[in-house]
Amino acid sequence: MGRLALDRETARSFARVALDNILRRYPYKLDHMMASAGDLAEPAAWHPVFCGSYDWHSSVHMHWLLVRLLALSPDLEEAPRIRAALDAQLRPEHIAVELAYFQRPHSRTFERPYGWGWMLKLQAELLALARQDAQAATWAEACAPLASHLSRQLADFLDAAVFPVRTGTHYNSAFALVMAMAYARTHQDLTLRRAIVRRAHRWFGHDQKYPARYEPGGDEFLSGGLTEAVLMHAVMDGCAFSEWWELFVPGQAELANWLTPVEVTNRSDPKTSHLDGLNLSRAWCWRMLEPALPDPLRPLAIRAWSDHLEASLPQAVEGEYVSTHWLASFAVLALAEPIGG
């Protein structure tokens, strides 16, 4: 899809940044509800696996990135380091502590839904790699209790949730469901899959003329509208999606807003720098949607994919830590996510 690709040198640079991130303990943004003074502890005490990479969810998807790179390039020069790091991190005794944190009365909604979606995406990647890699099978087995817990929690939450969150930040409903759907398919989790499909249709199935002119918000790293479209593509067959898209797509003037990369004016600001993530996630969305779009729009989608990548791809490895602790994962989604996956 265009001239940009996840070439070997790019994969190596992503591997190096991810390896550095998952082992970097500080700075760390701890999202922690304390019930008493006894709950004060260093992040690693609560999160022995996901205590690096600035925050919990970024650590999770940096682990996913490493697994994905192993799947894409098993002979990568950094592969031995990746395997050693994952072997040290993804151990049953460590995952048991992570699971216990989610089972605390005050932590039941911790990282919902973004971190939940990424953890399920990580487990989906481990399960896929485990089909041909015995070492990955041990990592998948170690992570299974946490993934199973979050799958049940997410299905229960979806049964009770009435309204979606459409903002393009960590609380976005559609993005979490796209990530979780990968697990539901790979693990053949029919309960979760049905919950996702049912809620996606109820939340987004009747949307029309999406107001793309209202995007983006100043700290958004997701397009609420494009991400919603990726979700609906994942839960519909081709004909149904084509009919849905015809009603959903913004008018031509507004659609141009999604086709043009956003300008990032302050890359040292943790919130403003989210806009680099928006460029990369839009590229991912266009990659996933392009084959299912009407013929006149497909060349525009390919051009948008390329333009958005060129605008922000360098920040994944060359930017400040507020960017490099997370952007490479979205770069790989945009460059190498299986279409329809």
Protein language model features and the residues they cover:
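Solvent-exposed loop and edge beta-strand segments that line ligand/cofactor-binding
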Residues: 3-8, 44-60, 100-116, 160-173, ...
